[in-house]
UniProtKB/Swiss-Prot annotation:
GO cellular component: extracellular region
Compartment annotation: Secreted
GO terms for MF: hormone activity; toxin activity
Main function: Vasodilator. Bradykinin produces in vitro relaxation of rat arterial smooth muscle and constriction of intestinal smooth muscle. May target bradykinin receptors (BDKRB).
Signal peptide residues on this chain, from the entry's feature table: 1-23
Keywords, sorted A to Z: Amphibian defense peptide, G-protein coupled receptor impairing toxin, Repeat, Secreted, Signal, Toxin, Vasoactive, Vasodilator
Keyword Repeat attributed: yes
Tissue expression from the record: Expressed by the skin glands.
Principal subcellular localisation of the protein: secreted
Protein name in UniProt: Kininogen-1
Keyword Cytoplasm belongs to the record: no
Family: Belongs to the bradykinin-related peptide family.
Domain of life: Eukaryota
Source organism of this protein record: Bombina orientalis
Amino acid sequence: MRLWFCLSFFIILCLEHFPGTLADERNVPESEEKTEQFLRDLSEISRLQRRPPGFSPFRGKFHSQSLRDLSEISRLQRRPPGFSPFRGKFHSQSMRDLSEISRLQRRPPGFSPFRGKFHSQSMRDLSEISRLQRRPPGFSPFRGKFHSQSLRGLSEIKRLKTTHKIH
């Protein structure tokens, strides 16, 4: 602990005496006149430079120019219903086609568009199978037949071990 303290004190002491380091920064007085002059210049600049409408300092001049051009274009050109400028003409057309297709084609009960036809069919088959087939005690559909079988086998093994210890 003392070694680290002495070492850090020595490094700071050396930095104080080298030119261009802490000593130079500390010896330059920060004048209040310079600070006030800087603030006055900054306020004059902000008063003289009026920003055009739609200008954002984070996006720059060209972005605001393109926004103004976009508003002129949108006034000149009328879009069809369902058009979105962020998606484009083709996207909105395909969305309309998709809605017409979904109206024409009725899905069977249990169908999910995220899983597909075969998944819903297998889910319906699974429910029919589960109604027809009763599960043995200890069976879990999440673990499978073999797991439950091994659990039942485990209880039989425990019974056999205890009977062998008694004899």
